């Protein structure tokens, strides 16, 4: 994941009483999938970038709820913690613009199916780039990865010593 812009607006966001804010999963929003958990009928977020209202988490013992959910669902979920989070926060999360968690794997997914118009690569660099799926910039055996040049720009940057 690469952050390319200030997170000031995100960190000062009015969460309107929601315990989490996230971006809808770009692929799962467009395909029908059925698993032992009933999440295919409600919006499902990608947990790679999650904004949490920690006051609410403490007041509502969210950590305990997540642990109980994980214990109950155990191996029955395809996306681990993401499914646990979506189960606990089902219909109780604030949806953010997709640029706050631009999921590169979605571009590849829809291109392979000749459906690029469903999820096109944006013309401008998003504030948060999430290199989803197995296609990672540091693994050279994958084809074209959206915004791979941004990853390498930050990787090769001359960072100050701490």
List where the protein language model places each region:
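A short, conserved beta-to-alpha structural element at the edge of catalytic cores
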Residues: 16-40, 139, 143-147
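A short secondary-structure junction signal
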Residues: 5-9, 31-35, 60-65, 141
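GT-A fold catalytic core of metal-dependent nucleotide-sugar glycosyltransferases
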Residues: 1-28, 42, 49-60
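A glycosyltransferase accessory/donor-loop signature
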Residues: 46-162
């Amino acid at each position: 994941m690469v952050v390319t812009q200030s997170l000031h607006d995100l960190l000062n966001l009015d969460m309107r009483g929601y315990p989490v804010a996230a971006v809808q999963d770009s692929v799962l929003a467009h395909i029908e999938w059925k698993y032992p958990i009933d999440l295919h009928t409600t919006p499902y977020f990608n947990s790679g970038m999650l904004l949490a209202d920690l006051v609410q988490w403490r007041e509502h013992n969210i950590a305990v709820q997540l642990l109980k959910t994980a214990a109950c669902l155990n191996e029955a979920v395809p996306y681990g913690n993401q499914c646990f989070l979506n189960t606990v926060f089902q219909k109780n999360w604030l949806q953010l613009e997709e640029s706050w968690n631009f999921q590169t794997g979605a571009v590849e997914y829809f291109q392979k199916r000749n459906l690029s118009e469903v999820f096109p690569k944006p013309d401008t660099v998003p504030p948060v780039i999430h290199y989803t799926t197995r296609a990672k910039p540091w693994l050279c055996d994958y084809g074209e990865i959206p915004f791979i040049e941004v990853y390498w720009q930050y990787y090769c940057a001359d960072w100050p010593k701490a």
